[in-house]
Amino acid sequence: NSTEMIRALLSGVEPEAARLKPNAEAWSILEVVCHLYDEEREDFREHLDFILHRQNETWHAIDTQGWVTQRKYNQQNLAEMQEKFFVEREKSLAWLKGLLNPDWEKTYTTEYRTISAGEMFACWAAHDNLHIRQLVELRRVRLENITRPYNLDYAGDW
């Protein structure tokens, strides 16, 4: 499952290496972990609950790009943020298992769009894959830095 893939991709990453960014616009491994933690708590589970059970409440906005600097993602403790994310993920999995006959076609309309419960759930899974890909790419950059001056072409096309 994607949780275990994320856990494996974070395994063995030293705190200082987790803060490295390939360029000024890119996220570090630590920033990805912090983002996953915030998304787990404040976006996907929360908004899926809005769609399924809280139609009369106001959908709250998220600011994924802003949170990176506002919440000082790259200054956080890697081990603590990993633990926080995995605890939240367990809460999410328990919450999902506790849903009784969810209506995946039920929709919620925000000021931006209408989204169904099924679409939100599918996007949650897709979001994990997006960041799994990002973590793989960040690990590749890390490997390039560690193995320099040697080139990695023989390993295959990247």
Show which residues each predicted segment covers.
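A glycine-rich, hydrophobic loop/mini-helix early in the fold
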Residues: 1-27
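Charged/polar positions within long, soluble alpha-helices
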Residues: 8-11, 15, 49, 53, ...
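Acidic/histidine-rich alpha-helical segments that form the ligand environment
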Residues: 2, 66-105, 119-124, 132-134
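Short low-complexity stretches enriched in small and charged residues
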Residues: 2-5, 45-51, 86-89
